[in-house]
């Protein structure tokens, strides 16, 4: 990914560093409008996810996470920007006339061919079951439930690694560092998700952040006591507690937030690294 730096003509562009713009001209039959209601609120109107609201209107692109066009070769026609994710997407024209969007694999260019199915070549962008992949293969868009579509390793630059196969399960090392078991019959896509340098971007100004639907972040210590447990006091006061807490009074910074007794506890061999 090429990073574009602006001339320092204004304060807004002085610290701005964005990727070279990939145009977006989506197909009408692969998009639909979505009503982004709530903006971080639940059904009762209470804030459950902070710092969200506003933002530009978006059209949702239908992404093929299942890759169920078996043994039919497709050609990459375009590489487009998707406002709903930080990874790019590719428009695929299949041999039977079907047209679908998929996540852009790193290194894929316009004109490359891809295919999904069993016993297909181990090539970047191809999708096949884990049982047909050799150990050490870099993969993304991994299924958890057979036939449901890829749910793991879908963000920009994400990549997992197949490290073992035993019995009916395969052992994967996920981008978070977690090591877990998944059925060998589940499918995944070979390669890494594109747009690897997304973390090198710098929006440079608050207005660009608002376009993305992200509101300003305010520290709890500068709020009033009615708004946050850290708030209140005369001048710059400490939080007044032994440990920092969330706005709802729960312990923050280090406490495990994963629910207990989940079905997948037995499938996780090693917790994710912090």
UniProtKB/Swiss-Prot annotation:
InterPro entries: NA-bd_OB-fold, Rib_uL2_dom2, Ribosomal_uL2, Ribosomal_uL2_bac/org-type, Ribosomal_uL2_C, Ribosomal_uL2_CS, Ribosomal_uL2_dom3, Ribosomal_uL2_RNA-bd_dom. Residues 1-23, 224-274 are annotated as: Disordered. GO terms for molecular function: RNA binding; rRNA binding; structural constituent of ribosome; transferase activity. GO terms for biological process: mitochondrial translation. SMART domains: Ribosomal_L2 (SM01383), Ribosomal_L2_C (SM01382). Keywords: Chloroplast, Plastid, Ribonucleoprotein, Ribosomal protein. The keyword Chloroplast applies. GO terms for cellular component: chloroplast; mitochondrial large ribosomal subunit. HAMAP family: Ribosomal_uL2_B. Part of the 50S ribosomal subunit. Belongs to the universal ribosomal protein uL2 family. NCBIfam families: rplB_bact (TIGR01171). This is Large ribosomal subunit protein uL2cz/uL2cy. It comes from Vitis vinifera (Grape).
């Amino acid at each position: 990914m090429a990073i574009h730096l602006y001339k320092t003509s204004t304060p807004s562009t002085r610290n701005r560093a964005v990727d070279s713009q990939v145009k977006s001209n989506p197909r009408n039959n692969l998009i639909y409008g979505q009503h982004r209601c709530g903006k971080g609120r639940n059904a009762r109107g209470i804030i459950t996810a902070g710092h969200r609201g506003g933002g530009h209107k978006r059209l949702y692109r239908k992404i093929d996470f299942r890759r169920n066009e078996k043994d039919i070769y497709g050609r990459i026609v375009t590489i487009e920007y998707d406002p709903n994710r930080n990874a790019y997407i590719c428009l695929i024209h299949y041999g039977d006339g079907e047209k679908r969007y998929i996540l852009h694999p790193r290194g894929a260019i316009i004109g490359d061919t891809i295919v999904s199915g069993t016993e297909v070549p181990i090539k970047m962008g191809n999708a096949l079951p884990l049982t047909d992949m050799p150990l050490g293969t870099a993969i993304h868009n991994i299924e958890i439930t057979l036939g449901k579509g890829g749910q793991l390793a879908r963000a920009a630059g994400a990549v997992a690694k197949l490290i073992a196969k035993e019995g009916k399960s395969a052992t994967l090392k996920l981008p978070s560092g977690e090591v877990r078991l998944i059925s060998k019959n589940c499918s995944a896509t070979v390669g890494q998700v594109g747009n690897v340098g997304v973390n090198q971007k710098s929006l440079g100004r608050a207005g660009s952040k608002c376009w993305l639907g992200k509101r300003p972040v305010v520290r709890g210590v500068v709020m009033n006591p009615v708004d946050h447990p850290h708030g209140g006091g005369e001048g710059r006061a400490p939080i007044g507690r032994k440990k920092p807490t969330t706005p709802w009074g729960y312990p923050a910074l280090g406490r495990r937030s994963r629910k207990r007794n989940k079905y997948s506890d037995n499938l996780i061999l090693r917790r994710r690294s912090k």
